């Protein structure tokens, strides 16, 4: 696999994120949830944002380290970003996420991108942990997180997805765990 790197976008690169959020295949994992989020379509999982809303989002998210970080994922052999990673402080825990554009899924990008995010979070920004809550039926996602050093904790959430109960569990990696792996 080619070299992966993370790059914080400039304001003129917001259209990538805006397009991914509208893409049915990229956002299909997000469908069925009862989210109170402006622009969210429960049937498709897509999220629609105006240009003005994207600029407001950008001003709230970009260059807010160490508590908030957002970057695009790049493969040096591909001219445009293939996805995004982020984390943010949420009740004393840094919640995080990763999104790979649909056409690049299944190629190992998640694992390598998680390693890059860990390096920035723990080595550059000195945060103590990264955490995500992932539905147990997303086996490939869980596999990538565990390969990158995350472990399941006892914290779980039950959510309704299209009226059916879904269980999601926390995956967590601490700075100490990260340092022991390196």
Give a label for each model feature:
Residues 8, 19-48:
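Helix-loop element at the rim of GNAT/NAT acetyltransferase active sites that forms part
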Residues 24-25, 61-65, 175:
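A general structural signal marking secondary-structure boundaries and capping sites
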